[in-house]
Regions:
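AMP-binding/adenylate-forming catalytic core of the ANL superfamily
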Residues: 230, 341-450, 504-505
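AMP-binding/adenylate-forming
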Residues: 147-160, 172-238
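Short, well-ordered beta-strand segments
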Residues: 174-175, 334, 424
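Nucleotide 5′-phosphate-binding alpha/beta core
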Residues: 1-132, 138-152, 156-159, 163, ...
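Phosphate-coordination loops involved in phosphoryl transfer and adenosine-cofactor binding
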Residues: 169-170, 256
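Adenylate-forming
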Residues: 209-210, 217, 223-271, 284-291
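Conserved AMP-binding/adenylate-forming
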Residues: 257, 266-268, 272-362
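Conserved S/T- and glycine-rich ATP-binding loop of Class I adenylate-forming
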Residues: 76, 133-136, 173, 230, ...
Length: 506
């Protein structure tokens, strides 16, 4: 008991003062949370505060952010090639930065990290893992992490699962993400194993193969009869829904209870159509990117994207001027990962290119104590400025994925034309009824539609939005791998499947 109390004090000191985390203390806290959940079945609010830190008023949080930013800026100016040169040119003392000085520091563009990744690695760091992004929306970038950082991320993920109860010892978690998404996969696998769940790293197989694995009955002692949790990109989840529909699957064929989605925009229509296939599953929608890890967000029941404030300074800046936006306005997320979470690849005011809308009113949701914005609107370079204003990928995707006439995931593109935007989309047919449905839903989402091109083949698209689900991987066939079953033609067949051997094509 004394050791656990000391570990809690050690964690509180790290969260409050920015001191390095103690891996031993984090592990003791995880053990304590596991014991509490086993005995009482749930973690009280005090347990959540232990992981997130105490709720701070805006003034106190702003003071802490400035102090942590100075600390990170000092290390960056002293120990990285990129920021040493930058602060020299700006003539700023990183130890004495004011908020006005912070605003003078230019955004760190993705292009700089992509072209000179080693210039951001701190000379005093001990990197042990070099992660690349998947490169879905551009050439991959490289980010280095230390063993301390990885242990910390896994520990906090595990504590998050234990506090929320969204993953436990009896669960079977199927991960359907690209095997190139090393950072997210390592953290997801490590945290799941730490809470005792069984992990199956499926990767991005052909959807029919993944459906077979999800429907497979298991008889592992202490585990549920079927896969109970799925981690997937929204676009790949859409492919699973579409394939499941074609193969005749029903909710009774699965045991899914929770679906974790991230890496792309998840729409209301996608989740509703996924529930039609898998049953009344609970969705956990998150946000995270390799460059700014562990600045990860979660979407609440009211549709707000919330962030734990101690891990990073998040600014929402105007698309044109770069100044801070006003409440209710749209801007780009500019993120500075802070100590004690980041010590290897240091990034100050990193331009994520992700667009959000600030909230016009204080939230009243379950996570109202955490900073929040709207759900992601999409990448800046994928948004379109037209005569009628900005049109964002979320508007188009929310409209299309709500329609059954548009196969999942929505295959589409859009661009500016006189008076608004032109939209192209793959649909099941090109009838007048389909066109009217698409036109109406786009207008309901506020898209100033002027031209609509309805196709029935992906190859006909001129400017398609990129999808992570297209980063497909291959498996050996005919060697004990999972076989695809059409539930309509063979409803009574009982099959045994082995886990597939993966070959990455990237």
């Amino acid at each position: 008991m004394i050791e656990v109390a000391f570990a809690q004090l050690r964690l509180a000191a790290s969260l409050a003062l920015g001191l390095p985390f103690s891996p031993r203390s984090l592990n003791r806290i995880i053990d304590s949370l596991q014991a509490t959940r086993c005995e009482f079945g749930a973690i009280e609010r005090s347990g959540a505060e232990l992981v997130q830190g105490p709720t701070l008023d805006p003034a106190s949080l702003r003071e802490i952010h400035l102090r942590r930013f100075r600390s990170q800026a000092r290390r960056a100016a002293k120990e990285t090639a990129y920021y040493s040169d930058l602060f020299g040119r700006l003539g700023l003392d990183p130890a004495r930065l004011s908020w006005e000085d912070v605003e003078r520091i230019p955004f760190t563009p993705k292009s700089a990290l992509r072209e000179r990744p080693d210039d951001f690695v701190r000379r005093g760091a001990r990197p042990t893992l070099n992660c690349t992004t998947t490169g879905t929306t551009g050439r991959p970038t490289n980010v280095c992490f230390s063993d301390y950082e990885m242990q910390t991320y896994i520990a906090f993920n595990a504590m998050g699962h234990l506090v929320s109860g969204d993953l436990g010892e009896s669960d079977i978690l199927h991960i359907a993400t690209s095997t190139r998404a090393v950072l997210g996969n390592i953290c997801a696998i490590g945290a799941a194993q730490r809470v005792g769940a069984l992990v199956l790293m499926g990767g991005l197989l052909e959807p029919a193969q993944t459906l077979t694995l999800l429907a497979q009955e298991r008889s592992i002692p202490g585990k549920k009869a079927r896969t109970s949790a799925l981690l997937a990109y929204p676009s790949y989840l859409g492919e699973l829904v579409e394939s499941g529909r074609q193969l005749g699957y029903k909710p009774a064929d699965f045991g899914l209870e929770r679906i974790f989605v991230g890496g792309e925009l998840a729409t209301t229509g996608l989740m509703a159509r996924a529930q039609a296939l898998f049953g009344e599953v609970t969705f956990h929608e998150g946000y995270g990117m390799t460059e700014t890890w562990p600045c990860n967000g979660t979407v609440c029941e009211a549709g707000h994207l919330h962030f734990e404030p101690s891990s990073a300074l998040i600014e929402v800046c105007d698309l044109e001027t770069g100044a801070a936006v006003k409440p209710g306005e749209v801007g780009r997320m500019v993120v500075t990962p802070l100590p004690p979470y980041r010590e290897t690849t240091l990034l100050l005011r990193y331009d994520t290119e992700d667009l959000v809308q600030t909230l016009g009113e204080p939230p009243t949701c379950r996570l109202r104590h955490l900073p929040a914005f709207s759900r992601l609107l999409g990448k800046r370079r994928l948004a379109v400025q037209c005569d009628a204003g900005w049109v964002y990928p979320r508007q188009v995707l929310e409209a299309l994925e709500a329609l059954d006439c548009a196969p999942l995931p929505a295959r589409c593109g859009f661009w500016a034309v006189a008076g608004g935007v032109a939209v192209e989309v793959v649909a099941r047919d090109r009838t007048a009824t389909t066109r009217r449905q698409i036109e109406n839903t786009l207008e309901e989402q506020g898209a100033p539609l002027r031209e609509l091109y309805v196709h029935t083949e992906r190859s006909q698209l001129r400017q398609p939005l990129p999808l992570r689900g297209d980063l497909k991987e291959l498996s050996f066939s005919g060697a004990g791998g999972a076989q695809t079953v059409d539930r309509r033609s063979a409803p009574h067949v009982e099959d045994e499947y082995a886990e597939p051997m993966l070959i990455s094509t990237f």
